[in-house]
Amino acid sequence: MERLLPEELIRTGSRIAERLRQRSVCVPIPERAMARTVTGANDPSLRHLTLRISEGGRIVVSGEKKKGVWIPFSVTFIAVAPPPGTAGPSVELHLERTSPFFAAPFVLRALGRMPEMEIIGNRARVRVDHWIDQQGWAESLPTGMFKRVRVTEVDTDPGNRQLLVTLGLAGG
């Protein structure tokens, strides 16, 4: 992995801030960063949690649930931009498919215990600023910029194992 020197980070952050002011910027969020969050779910009745990025904005969470015996499950979400006016940069994960049928509630409950997740009905709203902050160039963005940033589009790149999040400034 290439390392950027501090002055390169500042230049990169400045370029991104300028692109946000002008229009929008696409930020890749690696599958492994998202997987670290999901596998950290604090629920002893879940184990072997994995996250996989798939075609068409789909994110698949799978693992095992303790129901007397350990039962394998898989839950597929479609990642989309949140409705206009949603505070902060976030992505909505709409429930698409579950196997077995009873898997959705316990997966949503486990996700809802995480600080960056909010459960609304059968979908999860995920704050992505946490993942973006982990990227080196984000340190050099002007203070308070993330308060005005909104997600305008979401897609996936399964080949590179990334969630592609397009950011723009609110009202701009």
Language-model-detected regions and their locations in the chain:
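Extracellular/lumenal and peripheral-membrane lipid-interaction modules
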Residues: 1-172
